[in-house]
Amino acid sequence: SILFGYQRFLDNYLKNLSIEQCQKNHASKDCYNLNTYNNLDQRISLVDSLIHDKKLRKRYLERFIQEEIIYAETVKHLKHTSTLINKYNFSETEKKRLNSLINFQSSLIVNADLKKVKIISQDLQKHDLEDVMKKKLSVIYSWSIQSPSHHKLRIKKINELKAKYPNIQFIGINIDYNFPDQWLDAISKYNSNIDNEFMIAAEEHAPFYRNYLNKVIFLNKDCIVKKSEIILSNIEFDKHIEDFIASQ
């Protein structure tokens, strides 16, 4: 449709403009990574100044603010985004939802402690994350049975990473907590190595889990978050792992 085509054009325009502005202000920075807090904050500012149609403006602001929360790494980031939620004319329901997402993200930012996060093993027993980490540097990644083609690519990527970085523990966490049987079927069907495959236990923020698909969290040996804004498809993923190992 014409509207869809226009929105796609607008999406690309905002992306390109955010890259241009980043390059202008930060010559040494990697400005092409769009999945960062800073890039999303830049795009929110662009929407605020350039888009005046109420419906389009609302749609973009809600979307970019939600993504900005998910890529936030610090308390300062979340406080800034909280002011944006109050600044724009969102409904009370939407404000409540976004503030709830901030609350959830605050448990995943850098230096957050994930020892007591509840996960479910393949015998359907509940465990604390710290119990399966074996005091190793770990990379946690989330996935869903509802994306089978992506699941196959993920397995290929993870197997390559396991071979390259044998001292890192790669832990897969499935988000389909309502479908344990389908999860078990998927890991036995697709995975040659089913060690370190778990399912998240549902809690009050369960409706947000799907927003975190593809995100990767780097944990030190004490189950503390050291990096949380990376996605598995990042072209510099190896560099992020090497920097992580060197910093520990």
Predicted regions and their residues:
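Thiol-/selenol-based redox modules, centered on thioredoxin-like
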Residues: 218-248
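Oxidative protein folding and maturation machinery
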Residues: 1-124
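Short acidic, S/G/P-rich loop/turn micro-motifs used as interaction or catalytic elements
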Residues: 69-72, 145-149, 177-178
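Short, internal strand/loop/helix patches
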Residues: 10, 22, 42, 184-221
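Loop/turn elements at helix/coil->beta-strand transitions in domains of secreted/extracellular proteins
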Residues: 134-138, 165-169, 192-195, 221
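Structural microenvironment flanking redox-active thiols in thiol-disulfide oxidoreductases
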Residues: 149-189, 201-206
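Short active-site neighborhood of thiol/selenol oxidoreductases, capturing the structured segment around
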Residues: 127-158, 169
